[in-house]
Amino acid sequence: MNDKTSQSKEDKLKEARKTLKPKLDAMRDKWLAKKADDIQLAADSNHSKDVYAGIKAVYGPQSSGSSPVLNQEGTALLSDKKDILDRWAQHSNNILNRPSSISDEAIESLPQVDMNHSLDHPPTTKEVEKAIKALSVGKAPGADAIPAEVFKAGGPGLVSKLTELFSSVWAAGAVPQDFKDASIVYIYKNKGNRNSCDNYRGISLLSIAGKMLARLLLNRLLDHIDYLLPESQCGFRAGRGTADMVFAARQVQEKFQEQNREVFTTFVDLTKAFDTVSRSGLWKIMTKFGVPDKFSALVRSFHEGMQASVSIDGDVSESFEVTNGVKQGCVLAPTLFSIMFSGMLKNAFPDDEDSIPIKWRTDGGGLFKLSRLSAKKRVHHGHVRDLLFADDCALNARSEEAMQRSMDKLSAACEAFGLTISIKKTEVLHQPAPKTNPEKPTITVKGQCLQTVESFTYLGSTLSSNVVIDKEVESRIAKASAAFGRLRNSVWERKGLTLKTKIKVYQAMVLTALLYASETWTVYARHEKILNRFHLNCLRKLLHIKWQEHIPDTEVLERTKLPSVPTLLRKNQLRWAGHVVRMDDSRLPKQLLYCELAEGERSLGRQKKRFKDTLKAGMKDFGIDPDSWENTAANRTSWRSSVNRGAKKYEQARIDEAKMKRALRKSRSSSNDTQTPAGSFKCKSCSRTFTHHLGLFSHSRTHTTSN
């Protein structure tokens, strides 16, 4: 087949390629359509982890750590394979074995929770089945090379054997060495110097069987500690996600603007937070959280004696022991970190001093009735200080002095718990009270001044000190444009893919990036217009429509069977509002939606637009009664049906209105052309004549510009 001098063989090769190509195109089309459906479902369910995993699969593998890297001093570039492997092993060893400790005095200050001895009970068959079901397929396994698909297809017989294995591990109080060890691969972060090890992210490949046991432990641990974690912690907890904290942050900004108060928010960055957790201190904190010794010993066993090695293109470095930090790549790691971080926050802030007092009421006439908060009874009072997502921490305060005191307390607690605040990456966002011009604040950590910024990207969404989403819209368009560009050759220009599949990929990859966290936005008409213009431009490129064809926007939307951005925004926000309404009253997003500050007053006259104003307008556009919407939203199925019906009617009304306006413009133009002889459109400034009024209109703008 490779003999190029043989014409018959070359013809056979061409024929084989011709036969194979349609089959490969069909397979790719089917795979992309399925992956796009999965991404869209994850996006609709606010499962951000699954969204990003799907996006990575579509984009393909990222650059790994096989390229030349700088030595530890940063003075020489290493190109030899063995030198590169040794450098990565050295880098990993330095990161994963940083010494840290937690003060015994700080641990003793934490309250003791009653021991939950039910955690010590041996695992059951149902728990093993649940752990297997939670496994993610398509993931690289550890050193044993047994993928998750094998366990998922094993059936009852394998479940029984695994239950026996896990029970014996439970009785021994120690896990096998294979369950502990990790193989580390490095992926470039797509920012910074590609030759610097610091700009790569380490991924730990672990034994799938060990992951199942860790998942079993996690399921039990979550049931026990969920009520012990702060309400503001939304990282890696069921029913919570990044949208909760982005929404909370925007609501804090709006409430302070509405009631003419200033607010300070410090976004705290911790240096290698997961890798610097003191293990000995963590076990003691777990005891304080009511975790019994036997269960704690099993968790410890996953960490103590752990060996790791670096893998690059099939080559493996010498193994080294990992003595510090929670086990990266293990499902237990985020929860173990949250336990330690929760203990640190309790130590830093034992009371509500310097927090933000709020009052709220979820009954009394609904969200849009302000008088409900004037009642002397049934009004709840609370406080807001921190917004958390794993190790992402945003501290809020009402004054510069309160912010400084809070940072002093947090800094002292971090030092006591072995954590380090990154001065370079920690930033302050100051939102001054309306119609004031205050001086730039000075917030310090250990005598070093923190940078004050006008905007900050928090959990992927840009917050601005002026409480508008202009910069967020710019950022979203930039990210969506990059996503669209990355798929140009692999999807948009590929002839073997159907239009239906391309549209599915566009929805999952581009629209998801464009409208990320849009459910939390307070939207003005100008934002809708800019976003919709980008949306339609992408669809025109996808359909290969040229501007000379004069295809109206309505036809573009009808061809692709996609709604406009204004419809999508209203739909996202109303669905999110229903989700918030169904939350328990103890949840922070719900409290902030229904609350007002305990201090401060609204200005007289027209108020600046708020999220609930956007929400109310969306309800009216969708034909939903603003006075009774909460009753409908209490039922998820009924609410979604109402929102979907409203979206369909609103989009059709937009299309009909646009068509009517276009027809009216054409009729006017035709009438003018009939009544006015050719060449009689004359410029008043320079006497130039035109055959059509549109030419005169375009020409007249040159005089406006020159003036």
Model-derived segments and spans:
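Basic, alpha-helical interaction scaffolds
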Residues: A390, V445-W521, N537, P566, ...
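Conserved pre-motif C helix in the palm subdomain of viral-like polymerases
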Residues: D198-L229, D244-R250, F274, T323-P357, ...
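C-terminal recognition-helix end and immediately following basic linker
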Residues: L694-N707
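Conserved catalytic palm subdomain of right-hand nucleotidyl-transferase polymerases, strongest
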Residues: V128, G138-I146, N195-L205, A243-T287, ...
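Short, conserved micro-motifs composed of acidic
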Residues: S118, G366, S371, I421-E454, ...
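Surface-exposed loop/turn segments and immediately adjacent short secondary-structure elements
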Residues: D37, A42-C197, S204, K211-M212, ...
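Arg/Lys-enriched, amphipathic patches
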Residues: M1-L78, H117, H121, A134, ...
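Catalytic palm subdomain of template-directed nucleic-acid polymerases
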Residues: N2, K272-F289, G325-V326, D386-F417, ...
